[in-house]
């Protein structure tokens, strides 16, 4: 067996047969195709197949894709065209598109038209939009609806909303949480009652744009500092919210200091502000100072200015000079009051400047019909100008009682015309009956010109001493002025009011 293996391995391996001519040609073609597929030659290159680079595939024509993407330039041109359409639409409304340059607006005219129609539904006209075109940059759903919904929940009236938006359209840009709610919370913290908050915002919507740490806080702090009671702050803000926007150094402090200069104490000024806070809105240079000068020109003494302002603060804000000239002419012609005495009339009752001609003549005619001479009427009016503002029916009843029950001489009324200012049933009748019962004979001044406590003390006397009889016929003009002012306020809507409503002056 070993011999057989040796014999098998000893024979050499036969050489391969040479390929036939046909097979050699086929092998060459196959090798050439394989080489060309693996590394195609680059055009223009003289190198062999191993160094050739692939050709770039040709760009497909637009017709070869169903979703051809526009270029950035095409997109920008489209946006510009749509913005031009929106601008043209705004221009047709009278809005200057240039005012909105750089502001992002709705992409289409249809969306912008929807926004304009919403603003029109709030009773805002095209003129309003032209006055504040930035309102057109507010989204209806993101900006306007939340703000309007919040104002409505506060209690802002629907009919007051258009005026609020015209005066402060910036509210449409506001954030309810960041801008509006803190202001409302501040007002409530100043004791403005919840149902008064919407009235405050309706009257002074600019308040919604104030910062809490700014003018609002400083103005209130100053008022409290001069004596305005803390519990009255809410009432002051409710009746005159504009005070929250007044700068202390430029408006409030100069106003207070000027009133101090004419003799008013700070505490008296604080009481005026508590009662009539709108006086802070009277311009110092164009109203207050000229009116003070006018009073002096028409015979009012400088030392009486403080009393006049305290009794009738509105005198600081009306068109006073022409009013004084008209009233002085009326008093001179109808009551024979001299120019000097006219100043005394204003000092004792500053409200006399608002008396209508009809009211004056009606009271003068009544007094002359009672038997007084015009010269006596003049004296009575100068001493007690309140006669010209009292209720006519009450005056008639008082005079009838004086003439029929008291049976006194008319000269006593000339000396003490304030008799007509006392209540018949509350004061005159009971005091007269007590004096008559005691058998006293006294003047009208002794009878009436004292407090109830003082009168009760007098009724303990057995006789009236000489010093008691020499009672001053003067009376408290401060009390009378307050009484007359209250009557005038009660009778403002009465057709028989002694004040001519057509001649009354109110803050503008």
Swiss-Prot record:
Source domain of life: Eukaryota
Transit peptide location: 1-79
One of the protein's GO biological processes: developmental process
S-adenosyl-L-methionine is among the record's keywords: no
UniProt cross-references to Pfam families, sorted A to Z: mTERF
Subcellular location: Plastid, Chloroplast stroma
Biased composition (Low complexity): 28-49
UniProt biased composition (Acidic residues): 484-508
Name of the protein in question: Transcription termination factor MTERF4, chloroplastic
Organism encoding this protein: Oryza sativa subsp. japonica (Rice)
């Amino acid at each position: 067996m070993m011999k057989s293996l040796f014999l098998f391995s000893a024979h050499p391996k036969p050489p391969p047969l040479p390929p036939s001519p046909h097979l050699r040609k086929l092998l060459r073609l196959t090798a050439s195709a394989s080489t060309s597929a693996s590394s195609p030659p680059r055009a223009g290159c003289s190198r062999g197949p191993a160094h050739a680079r692939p050709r770039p595939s040709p760009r497909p024509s637009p017709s070869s894709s169903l979703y051809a993407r526009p270029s950035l330039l095409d997109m920008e041109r489209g946006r510009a065209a749509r913005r031009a359409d929106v601008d043209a639409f705004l221009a047709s409304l009278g809005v200057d598109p240039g005012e909105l340059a750089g502001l992002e607006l709705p992409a289409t005219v249809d969306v912008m038209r929807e926004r304009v129609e919403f603003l029109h539904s709030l009773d805002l006209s095209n003129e309003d939009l032209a006055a504040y075109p930035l309102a057109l940059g507010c989204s209806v759903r993101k900006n306007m609806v939340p703000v309007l919904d919040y104002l409505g929940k506060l209690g802002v009236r629907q009919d007051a909303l258009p005026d609020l938006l015209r005066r402060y359209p910036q509210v449409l840009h506001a954030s309810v949480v960041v801008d509006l709610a803190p202001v409302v919370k501040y007002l409530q913290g100043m004791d403005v009652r919840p149902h008064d908050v919407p009235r405050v915002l309706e009257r002074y919507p600019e308040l919604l744009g104030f910062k809490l740490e700014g003018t609002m806080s400083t103005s209130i702090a100053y008022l409290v500092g001069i004596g305005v009671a803390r519990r009255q702050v809410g009432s002051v803000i409710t009746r005159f919210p504009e005070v929250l926007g007044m700068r202390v150094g430029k408006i409030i402090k100069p106003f207070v200091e000027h009133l101090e200069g004419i003799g008013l104490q700070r505490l008296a000024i604080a009481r005026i502000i508590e009662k009539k806070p709108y006086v802070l809105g009277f311009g110092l240079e164009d109203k207050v100072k000229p009116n003070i000068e006018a009073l002096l020109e028409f015979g009012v003494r400088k030392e009486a200015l403080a009393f006049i302002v305290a009794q009738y603060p509105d005198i600081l804000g009306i068109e006073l000079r022409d009013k004084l000239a008209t009233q002085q002419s009326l008093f001179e012609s109808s009551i024979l009051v001299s120019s000097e005495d006219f100043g005394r009339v204003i000092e004792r009752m500053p409200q006399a400047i608002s008396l209508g001609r009809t009211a004056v003549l009606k009271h003068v005619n009544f007094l002359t019909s009672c038997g007084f001479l015009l010269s006596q009427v003049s004296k009575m009016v100068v001493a007690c100008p309140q006669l010209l503002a009292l209720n006519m029916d009450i005056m008639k009843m008082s005079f009838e009682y004086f003439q029929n029950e008291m049976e006194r001489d008319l000269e006593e009324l000339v000396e003490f015309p304030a008799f007509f200012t006392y209540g018949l049933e509350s004061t005159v009748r009971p005091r007269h009956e007590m004096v008559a019962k005691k058998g006293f004979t006294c003047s009208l001044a002794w009878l009436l010109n004292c407090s109830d406590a003082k009168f009760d003390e007098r009724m303990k006397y057995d006789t009236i001493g000489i010093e008691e009889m020499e009672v001053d016929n003067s009376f408290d003009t401060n009390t009378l002025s307050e009484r007359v002012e209250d009557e005038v306020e009660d009778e403002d809507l009465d057709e028989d009011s002694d004040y001519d409503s057509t001649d009354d002056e109110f803050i503008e």
